Amino acid sequence: MDKLRLEVERWLNHPNVNWELKQQIKELNESEIQELFSLEKPLFGTAGVRNKMAPGYHGMNVFSYAYLTQGYVKYIESINEPKRQLRFLVARDTRKNGGLFLETVCDVITSMGHLAYVFDDNQPVSTPLVSHVIFKYGFSGGINITASHNPKDDNGFKVYDHTGAQLLDTQTNQLLSDLPCVTSMLDLELQPNPKFVHTLDNEKVYKNYFRELKKVLVINNNNFKDIKVVFSGLNGTSVCLMQRFLKYLGYSNIISVEEQNWFDENFENAPNLNPEYKDTWILAQKYAKKNNAKLIIMADPDADRFAIAELNNNQWHYFSGNETGAITAYYKLNHKVFKSPYIVSTFVSTYLVNKIAKRYGAFVHRTNVGFKYIGQAINELSQTNELVVGFEEAIGLITSDKLNREKDAYQAAALLLEIARHCKEQNITLLDFYKRILSEFGEYFNLTISHPFKATATDWKEEIKALFNQLINANLTEVAGFKVVKVHLDKQTNILEFGFENGWVKFRFSGTEPKLKFYFDLTNGTREALEKQAKKIYKFFVNLLKLNKA
């Protein structure tokens, strides 16, 4: 019997594993067993550890949460004074088992002699609010039980330092290296102390947060606050709080997508939880049509991602993260006086903001992919500079360094609706506003494509290295008829860039699954010509790497 089968048998016969998990184990197929019972330690991705709720060392279950929490607390202990009692915030989103996993995390924290703070009544909490409370209320760190916009059967484990910023790779690698082998998670003995668990005053936290959020506004007037706006929280943490916040700001015509604006752990009326995809908007568009509304705003289930769509000439335009980042930067730099302004974005996000920043005396700081890098960059830069916006090509942004260190749907809603009202005053649309930016700085075309490939090697990461080497060693001087002026592999970020005379395509592989991501940033041409160029380049590389056989 191989090692994995022995581990399966161990789980099936272990007294700490309940009947429900044992039944789930019996229903697993071979590939699921390989994934869930691997003896490797879990991997932290761009936003924590995420996987489906399932048995095994890599499923999200009470054992894996206890194991990861133990490692996290030990890491935070190591960077604090010895024997100091630490304070941790523990929160969860609206997903299944959130309450159970939260209780498990608190049990580990209190067993280790520290204090755990939770929201009253086990209330689901938005990710930006978690970061805010850690940042503002003096916590040693925090654990967020969330899988953000992942499929409904997933859950996750997200960890923060005392500033409310996510831990970086070097820190999570240290966390994992100090943990024993994964097989130990079944035998972890806990002695929880309920006296070490404290509840927060939810109302007090919300009201303080709203007051702080209001400060992100640039021009705080009441013009057009009766603007019709359809809102969906996709059955997540913002379903009540966002509407309450917008009313606090004075908006009087917020139209709620009722089926998607209540806590539903099954997400029955929200089949897709990622606002980046158009099918996520179908129900909200029906509400917009019924109420003759031309704006829809949406937050993903943990309310870090924020998206906005606008009806133009009977067609919906879904603003990308690149577009809202550029719009926010341009608007704020035009209407606010800054001392040493800066923008933070990732290496794969649009360089249009570099041109905007240059005109207004701002600088752009680039980071690796993932908002954890943006959050930590803000920690460093905010000491002597003033944030304009932090954003990435995946929807979502932060507009203030005084609130938190996460993408924040509430900040984004406040500012982008202000900009939408400003456009209404000018008798233009939000899309017109973006086009004016392009008319000043030149057309930019951005596109992100995630392409799966069929891995044949046992270790698909080795196959990834081979593909990258193939691209580098091809010594390409042109791609699909376009001259190559640069080929560069950044060894810190593992992002491979092919530069052209009018922009670039960058490649990045997922750290957790065999997928290759293409990021395009092209300029100097009409939108149609740039889109055509991107498609030609994409097709060339798909054929070169034989990805069409995926």
From Swiss-Prot:
Annotated signal sequence range: none
Classification via InterPro entries: A-D-PHexomutase_a/b/a-I, A-D-PHexomutase_a/b/a-I/II/III, A-D-PHexomutase_a/b/a-II, A-D-PHexomutase_a/b/a-III, A-D-PHexomutase_C, A-D-PHexomutase_C_sf, A-D-PHexomutase_CS, Alpha-D-phosphohexomutase_SF
Record's cofactor remark: Binds 1 Mg(2+) ion per subunit.
Entry binding sites for Mg(2+): S148, D300, D302, D304
UniProt-listed Enzyme Commission number(s): 5.4.2.8
Catalytic activity field: alpha-D-mannose 1-phosphate = D-mannose 6-phosphate
Cofactor section: Mg(2+)
One Pfam family per UniProt: PGM_PMM_IV
Keyword annotations of the record: Isomerase, Magnesium, Metal-binding, Phosphoprotein
Family matches, as PROSITE patterns: PGM_PMM
Gene Ontology biological-process entries: carbohydrate metabolic process; purine ribonucleoside salvage
Enzyme class, spelled out: isomerase
Gene3D superfamilies cross-referenced by the UniProt entry: Alpha-D-Glucose-1,6-Bisphosphate, subunit A, domain 3, Alpha-D-phosphohexomutase, C-terminal domain
GO MF, any single term: phosphopentomutase activity
KW Glycosyltransferase (keyword) present: no
Residue numbers annotated as active site: S148
Family under the similarity heading: Belongs to the phosphohexose mutase family.
Name of the protein described by the UniProt record: Phosphomannomutase
Name of the encoding gene: manB
